[in-house]
Amino acid sequence: MRRYLILIVALIGITGLSGCYQTSHKKVRFDEGSYTNFIYDNKSYFVTDKEIPQENVNNSKVKFYKLLIVDMKSEKLLSSSNKNSVTLVLNNIYEASDKSLCMGINDRYYKILPESDKGAVKALRLQNFDVTSDISDDNFVIDKNDSRKIDYMGNIYSISDTTVSDEELGEYQDVLAEVRVFDSVSGKSIPRSEWGRIDKDGSNSKQSRTEWDYGEIHSIRGKSLTEAFAVEINDDFKLATKVGN
């Protein structure tokens, strides 16, 4: 009986050691001062500039999370953001449908390759991403002339009837937290004091009015924030696209 107990303890110890080794063996560790080069599975890899469509991304191989702030000009890592920096949120390594590997970066997926292929394939470029100031220094504002539009970074975005699914939603950006009643044709906001009034001809003014409860704003996976984003309207997320595109 004693031998049996000793054998069980020994087996548990071996299993525990192998489990710990497997976990550490698969960790992702970025090279010091680099946002593209890293170690995975005891091998050197780099993040390429080749984007993988979301529909081609399958299961995750290893889960991790890392936030890096990179200066756009010097490409040096920073401890805090500035007006010329890019914030990269790197998380998880995935297997693609063709069995290649990719990494999640800012709601997109970029192919990773062994470091030996670096001369033949371009590494990830910071130009693929918005500078930090584009997101943090400007607020989303409902247009004062048309409640169906959003003013962001000096550009106008039109809110469409197209629904954005939960799977398409990217990172949280802002919240509007406002209710507006506006003319259904012109989009002009109607003052709260006039919401319940009756028109001179006796018809109910609400018949040509629309009420929107504005909520959160999210980026959309695979799209630049300056191109389009999702706005929560009456508990559904609607697509807002840049006017003039």
From Swiss-Prot:
The keyword Nucleotide-binding does not apply. It comes from the Bacteria. A lipid is attached at C20 (N-palmitoyl cysteine). InterPro entries: Spa1_C (IPR040876). It is a lipid-anchor. The keyword Nucleotide-binding does not apply. GO terms for cellular component: plasma membrane. It comes from Lactococcus lactis subsp. lactis. Involved in immunity against exogenously supplied nisin. Residues 1-19 form the signal peptide. Keywords: Bacteriocin immunity, Cell membrane, Lipoprotein, Membrane, Palmitate, Signal. Pfam families: Spa1_C. This is Nisin immunity protein. It is found in: Cell membrane. A lipid is attached at C20 (S-diacylglycerol cysteine). GO terms for biological process: bacteriocin immunity.
